[in-house]
Amino acid sequence: VKLGPYAVTLEAPLSVALNAADAWRIGLFGVPRAPAGTPSEIAQGALRRNAGAVLNAGEGHFWFMWVSDFGKSLRGAWETLGADYLGGQIDFMTRESARLGYVPSCFNRFHGFDMPWPRGDSLPWLIFAHGERLRRTGRAPDAESREILQRLFDVYEATHFADGIISKEITGDWADTVRRPSSTYNNLCALMALREAPALGLKTRGDAQTLAGRIIADRWRGDHFRDHAATEALSADSAVLSLYLGLFDRAILEKAADRISAERLDQPWPIRCAATPHDGATVPLLTRLVSGYHRAAWLHLGAMWLNGLKRMGRDVGPGRARLDELILRHGHILEAVNDDGSPYRSLVLSSERGLTMAAAQYLELAGL
């Protein structure tokens, strides 16, 4: 059922209730502390507690598994959760996507669904997950899985592209409380998937080199990416993802990193998810109740930023120290914090705690 832009599923009321209850609980009692330990031990504990029938996105109210959260967690979660568990999650998402005919944004232990709406990054992160398993274990998709992935990729390319780039009709992505038309982030995810496809035995209509050229021509502005097709505003998540995956030449990545630093988006905590407030046309009514959420520092994106800088050989010691400070202060891996380091909170939404992709990105940063 559709309600405006929202996909209304049986899980939606539960998610709203969990978010609101957690916001009030944190407002009254603060963030409940996890068992004491070093930042790495706290991160590992969060992953283990979230690893149930599906790898829940968090401990407080994200009691589902988003495909993109899972994909961004893989590099850091591998040693803690193991190939058997993570591989089982990859296989479950693949089989369920085959049943649905597309890759939904979210899963519980029973089925896949979209929440709060379909997203353009789901298929790419499932493809990335298969690629990461291949790199880690040498296990390529078997014939059945490869056939499923080929069908899913065919559907993705047929429905998501227009004129060689992600269509403006595709407005959902990981920042899933705003609707960015043809977000540069979604285009970078498509580039990631096209780069992964050949090693998995998949055939694609497009190719990575051509799409990379289109992205640079359409979205690169000399020292930054613009956020989406309808704006010239600087994109933080596009810079971070490009660094993390090494999607472009080093000269471009260096300029993108320098601009993020010059804008002080990684201060006082790494990293603000948006350089400027989102255009009102991209912000649905319910999101306007939590407008400060997108001006907070999102620590999973911050850890990914630091991992990208680390791959470029830059000093990440000060940034990691700030993450350590927050983890030890709250006794948890948080999702989003205000300038004073307190957890973001509104009447209906609070920062998640024990956030899977933040914990995993931190462990990747720590080299564990």
Task: Show where each model-derived region lies.
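Low-complexity, Ser/Thr/Pro/Gly-enriched N-terminal "stalk/linker" regions
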Residues: 2-65, 85-92
